[in-house]
Regions:
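Beta-propeller blade termini
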Residues: 64-72, 93, 117-127, 131, ...
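Surface-exposed loop and turn segments in beta-propeller and other repeat-based domains
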Residues: 46-58, 109-111, 267-272, 317-333, ...
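Solenoidal tandem-repeat scaffolds enriched in leucines and small polar residues
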Residues: 151-153, 159-258, 262-282
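Hydrophobic beta-strand segments that make up the repeating blades of beta-propeller
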Residues: 77-84, 131-137, 178-185, 237-242, ...
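Beta-propeller blade repeat segments, especially FG-GAP/WD-type strand-to-loop junctions
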Residues: 38-45, 88-107, 140-155, 192-212, ...
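Beta-strand-rich domains and repeat architectures in extracellular enzymes and scaffolds
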Residues: 49-87
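Gly/Ser/Thr/Pro-enriched helix-cap/hinge segments flanking short amphipathic alpha-helices
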Residues: 37-38, 42, 46-57, 152-154, ...
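Surface loop/turn motifs at the tips and blade-to-blade linkers of beta-strand repeat domains
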Residues: 58-62, 110-114, 157-161, 215-220, ...
Length: 522
């Protein structure tokens, strides 16, 4: 995916001068004029000033740069933790008032005084109701137990010395403790590397004595992994997206069946070989058929894939759907794009999912675009997608990496945060005029798996059913723990039901829209 270490890295001071984060318009001014937008529901975002933070470092930090979103102090406002690479991570505590301009303060605790970090994923690892952080590193990873006040304490976990770039977690049937997996990139100890020197990956399952490691091999330089119940049979399997730049010939995308002894799905199961410069995984039921499409970021074409039949067979959607996003859509750099984090979400609340793709050159790869703006692909009524990144104001030219679409100020609109390599972290507030209705659904369970990882939520607005799985993992080096957001168009009420982890469906219940709904498993 990039050159060997040691090639020339040019200064980065001038990069991103046209970036949206440098616009002088304030959020407050845009909020005051938002009703005057030319086109109803045309997406609009305004840059938000935030404490300075940069993801930096040499060759080992060309990848990574993840962003974790979690409510670390129980005030229902999403806080941010951004990996720093050679810099320490930062924790931005959300101080926003509902419906007002987004504000953050730097509240980085001593436990995050770490270097060589590549990513961060939030989940409740010890079932105490406080969200924890898995910090991925070039070196030993660190699990931090949350204390409920945005401070953390290191947990006793030894995952070895690897170049960690991906993470996912789930709760398997009959288990009170989580199963988690860590994806590793190049084996730095291989003297023949870095090419054709991909490290193995690790699966950690609970035992009476803690967790035991199962080595998942072959490894193909994973940059994103995700436990997902793709078959909707109650068992999450482990998808891996891998970087062909380093596995060269013999690798491919992978899907591990989480049986007593994990095994790879093969052609005999219907699995088809796919190769790409896999950077990130996102899943969403875009066509409302009850099955998730899979969106994989890469160099050149981004790959949106649909399941074929009941098995693990996937094929690319037609190019005409508008999801390839293979080249910059503004500027005069016609070289292929480089995609990283993909985040689905309905930014206009019109009932159709949209997709944000963080873009940016690895460092100075001459075969790929240097002026490579982020994408905001807006879902259209016919199932296609239309580019609106420039119109919306999020077409940053920085080297973007991790990202999140999440409601940061409780107004029912999804806002945007992006980590950049060798450039400041950016946050944008969604100020779209005349949006549709929405529903936010937060699930909790008592005693174990407090965030209901593995649950499915279905919301019926009378025209279609949106199905959503609660997961931990995917993306590029970071993820979101929090309520699930549904855009609902003109619906004033919807029907809702839950399939709790390893349980049955609840009855349908009718609820009003435009509210934050919290449900606890009986």
């Amino acid at each position: 995916m990039y050159k060997r270490p040691g090639f020339c890295e040019k200064p980065d001071a001038a990069r991103g001068q046209r970036a949206v984060g440098h616009l002088t318009a304030t959020v407050a001014a845009l909020l005051a004029t938002v009703g005057q937008a030319d086109t109803p529901m045309e997406p609009r975002f305004a840059p938000v000033p935030v404490p300075h933070h940069v993801y930096d470092g040499g060759w080992e930090h060309f990848v990574g740069g993840g962003l974790a979103v979690l409510d670390c102090d129980g005030d229902t406002r999403p806080d941010l933790v951004a990996a720093g690479g050679s810099n320490p991570p930062i924790l931005l505590r959300n101080t926003s008032d509902v419906g007002r301009p987004i504000t953050f303060v730097d509240a980085t605790p001593p436990a995050l005084d770490l270097t060589a970090t590549t990513g961060a994923y939030p989940f409740d690892a010890n079932n105490d109701g406080h969200l924890d952080l898995m910090i991925l590193r070039v070196g030993p990873d660190v699990l931090l137990h949350g204390k409920g006040d945005c401070t953390f304490a290191p947990a006793p976990l030894d995952t070895g010395d690897h170049w960690s770039t991906a993470f996912s977690a789930t709760w398997e049937a009959g288990q009170s403790e989580p199963t988690f997996a860590i994806g590793h990139y190049v084996d730095r100890a291989d003297p023949e590397g870095p090419f054709e020197a991909c490290d193995t990956n690790s699966l950690w399952r609970p035992t009476p004595m803690g967790h035991a490691e199962t080595v998942l091999e072959p490894g193909h330089c994973a940059l994103s992994i995700l436990f997902t119940d793709w078959a909707r049979n109650g068992r999450p399997d482990l998808r891996m997206s891998n970087d062909r730049h380093y596995y060269i010939r013999d690798g491919q995308e992978q899907l591990w069946a989480m049986e007593a002894t994990p095994r790879l799905y093969t052609q005999d199961d219907g699995w088809a070989r796919h190769t790409l410069w896999g950077m990130g995984i996102a899943t969403r039921d875009l066509d409302r058929d009850g099955r998730d499409e899979v969106y994989l970021s890469s160099m050149g074409d981004q790959r949106l894939m649909e399941q074929q039949g009941d098995g693990p067979a996937y094929k690319d959607v037609p190019f005409a759907r508008g999801t390839a996003a293979q080249r910059p859509y503004i500027g005069d750099d016609g070289r292929p794009s480089t995609g990283w984090h993909i985040a689905f979400g309905d930014v206009q609340n019109n009932g159709r999912d949209d997709a944000f793709i963080a873009k940016g050159n690895v460092q100075q790869m001459p075969g790929n675009a240097m002026e490579d703006p982020n994408n905001l692909l807006i879902g259209m009524a016919d199932g296609s997608f239309a580019e609106r990144g420039d119109v919306a104001g999020v077409a940053s030219m920085h080297r973007s990496r991790g990202a999140a679409l999440v409601d940061l100020n409780g107004d029912g609109l999804l806002d945007l945060a992006v980590v950049n390599r060798r450039a400041p972290l950016e946050v944008w507030q969604n100020v779209t005029a005349n949006p549709g209705t929405w529903l936010s659904v937060a699930l909790t369970q008592p005693r174990t798996n407090t965030q209901a990882v593995g649950a499915w939520i279905e919301v019926d607005d009378g025209t279609a059913i949106q199905a959503r799985e609660v997961t931990v993992g995917g993306g590029h080096a970071g993820g979101v723990a929090g309520p699930q957001h549904f855009g609902l168009g003109t619906a004033q009420t919807v029907k809702l039901r839950i399939r709790w982890p390893h349980g049955d469906w609840t009855d349908w219940q009718t609820v009003p829209t435009n509210q934050n709904l919290s449900l606890t498993r009986p």
